[in-house]
Amino acid sequence: MDRETVDGEITSGASGAFARCGVVLAVPALLLVGSCAASAQGPKLLLPMATLQTAAAFDAARAAFEHCRKAGYTVTVAVVDRGGHALAVLRDPLAGPHTVNTAIGKASTAASFRMDTGDLARETQSGRPQSGIRDVPGVVAVGGGLPVQAKGSLVGGIGVSGAPSGDADTICAKAGIAAVSDNLELE
């Protein structure tokens, strides 16, 4: 067996290498244990948040879609999560091709700014202090998008595109939220 000297002691080759590594590994292990204990006492790293489920998104989209259809409008309805990612999109076969991206954009904008996109349109008109918001990529400052909230927390947005006006789109979006609002508050 090979013999080495570690800290003045004679050891065999294998255990000598282990002895050196053991000391080197022990220090990071103690630091890791210490950091775990510190994080247990420190601030939380994850935030609990309400999340809109796909079934609720679909129910809201369907209710908005049917409300518009009964009014004689051919529209697209989109529901997004709080990050603006599409959860449900319903498009009438006769709705214009632009309505899909516009509905998603309205829903995402409503969620991002936490406000009715019709109000955002008024607040960002030319000459207003916030008019530059209209130039932000992905922002759709046209009526028809509403934030979706549950127990006071933002969980997503709904957007409707294709009705004769932004106000008509908004009425349909409100019908979609109303269809699921009781269930959102219970969960």
Language-model features: locations:
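N-terminal secretory signal peptides that target proteins for export/translocation
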Residues: M1-A19
